[in-house]
Amino acid sequence: MKTLEKLSFPKLENEFLENILRQLVNQHTVIQMFFTRQPSFVFSYLIIHIEKNIDAQELQQNKWVKKVRKRYQIDVYFIYSERLHHRFSLGHPFIEFYCQPSAIIYQNKELENPLIVKRDWKKYKKRFNMFEDHFHHDHDLHLSQVQNLISEGSSNSVFTSYARLIEYDLEYLEELYSGNRSASLNLDERITNLIEYIPDIQKYFVRNSHSKYYLIDLFVKAKEASINDDEAIYKNEMYEAVGIAEQSLYRLIEERFDELKTLIKKGLFEKHDVVCQIDDKPEDVIL
C-alpha cells in the first residue's frame, strides 16, 4: 500500500484533484500520468495511462471526471496501455504532443511498458504525414460517394451519405482535440461536446431545440425516408447548406492538424523541474 499523504502533484495546483489521484494510485494500476496546463479559456489535459481496458472504461465514467472538467477546465482521459502504445505507433499527433516526457507528473517504475517519447520532429514527420494522409484519403472516398449520389439525383441517399461523412469528420475532431472518439453518442451529442473545444462549430450547425440541430434532424428524416422508400422531399439547394457545414468541419480538422504540427515541431513544452515528490518510494518516479 502506498502512503497517500506522501504523494503530491503541485503542478496541478488543485487540491481536490490531488486527493483523487492519491486514491487512484493506491487503488489501481496506474502506469503514468501526463498533465498539460492550457490557458484558462481552453481545457488543460490530464492523461492517465492505466494497465487494463476495463479499468480505463470504468474510471472514465466516474462522476469526478465530469466535475473536474466542468469546474476546473481539466479534461481527464483514461487510456489503457495497449491502446496508448498503438496510437503512438500510428503517429497520433494528440498522443505525440500531450504525452511528451516534460508532461509526465507521475510514473510507476515498477510497472512495465511506460510510454517514453524520445523522437524529434525529424523522426516523427513521416508518421505524422501518414496519419494525416489517412484522414484525407478516407475523407475523399466519402466525399466522392456523396458527389456520385448527387449526380444520380438520389436525394435521400445523398443526405444519409453526408451524415456518414460528417460523422467521420466529427470522429477526427474528437481524436485531435480530446484523444478519443465518442462513438456511443449520437451526432447531436457529439456536436454539443465538441463546441466546448471548438466554439466555431456553432456557426455551422443551427439548433432547432436546446440539444438538437437542424441538419442532424434532416439526416434522420432522410434515413427514414430511404428505409420506407418515400419520395424525396428535399430541394437541391439544401445540398449547399450541408456541403458548407461539412467543408467547415474539414477546414477545422486541417487547422487542428496544422496547430499540433506546429506545437510538436517547436517543442513548446516547458522544461520542468520535479513537479511531484514522494518520499521513500523509489519505485514511483515523479517527474
Q: Where do the model's predicted regions map?
A:
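Short N-terminal helix-loop-first-beta-strand/juxtamembrane motif that initiates sensory/input modules
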Residues: T29-Q32, S155-N156
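Conserved NTP/Mg2+-binding pocket subregion across the NTase superfamily
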Residues: M1-F9, K70-E152
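Terminal, compositionally biased segments
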Residues: M1-L4, T36-S40, S44, Y106-R127, ...
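Hydrophobic alpha-helical packing segments in soluble, helical-rich domains
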Residues: S154-A183
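Metal-dependent nucleotidyltransferase catalytic core
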Residues: M1-Q27, F35-G91, E96
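Generic structural signal for well-ordered, non-transmembrane alpha-helical segments
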Residues: H137-D140, A163-E167, G243, Q247-Y250
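Long, charged low-complexity segments
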Residues: E174-L287
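Amphipathic, non-membrane alpha-helical segments in soluble helical-bundle scaffolds
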Residues: K125-H136, S155-A163, F205-I216, K235-V242
